């Protein structure tokens, strides 16, 4: 289903209850909003027959805590499947990297997809190379599971550890 706000309406909750009652397999491919997961909703989501996994958006550092809270609630009611996180890469390299790495360190049950931020009002926007490289590393699991981002070599002669050195020069005290 393509409704990232399904948890925000009573009608949406009724639809999920119907999905559970009918035993339908479902995928909310636009990601759910973890901030809206209550104990009752977690209990309901744990009963859903997911096609693959539960999807959440995790576009800011504050959403990590909300996703963690939601995961704990849903798991409390017996869900043992995978979780998938959409991570938009914003302007801050360190913040984006730390958010992505948080889920990497949680293990294979937590899968994520990264996408550079695209400004729909600026069709000529230039995507920073670090965003391209970070999303390339994350989204291709053969790289993501076999090396750390610092060691990732997206182009001959360039390792991504360079991004950490560049940021240290830009940010005093880093």
Language-model segments: residues:
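Auxiliary Fe-S-binding modules of radical SAM enzymes
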Residues: 88-174
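Generic hydrophobic segment detector
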Residues: 16, 58, 62-63, 68-76, ...
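Core AdoMet radical
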Residues: 1-70, 81-91, 111-115
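Generic secondary-structure transition motif, activating predominantly at the C-termini of alpha-helices
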Residues: 20-23, 49-50, 75, 138, ...
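Surface-exposed amphipathic alpha-helices with a cationic face
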Residues: 20, 71-78, 101-104
């Amino acid at each position: 289903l393509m409704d990232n706000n399904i948890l925000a309406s009573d009608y949406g909750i009724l639809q999920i209850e119907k999905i559970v009652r009918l035993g339908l397999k479902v995928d909310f491919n636009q990601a759910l909003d973890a901030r809206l997961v209550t104990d009752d909703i977690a209990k309901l989501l744990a009963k859903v027959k997911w096609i693959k996994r539960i999807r959440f958006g995790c576009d800011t550092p504050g959403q990590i805590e909300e996703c963690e809270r939601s995961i704990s609630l849903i798991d409390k009611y017996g869900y043992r499947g995978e979780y998938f996180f959409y991570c938009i890469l914003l302007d801050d390299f360190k913040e984006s990297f730390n958010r992505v790495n948080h889920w990497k360190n949680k293990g294979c049950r937590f899968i994520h997809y990264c996408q550079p931020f695209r400004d729909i009002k600026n069709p000529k926007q230039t995507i920073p190379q670090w965003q391209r490289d970070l999303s390339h590393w994350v989204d291709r699991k053969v790289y993501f599971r076999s090396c750390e981002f610092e060691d990732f070599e997206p182009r001959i002669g360039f390792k991504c550890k360079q991004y950490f050195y560049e940021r240290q020069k830009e940010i005093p005290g880093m």
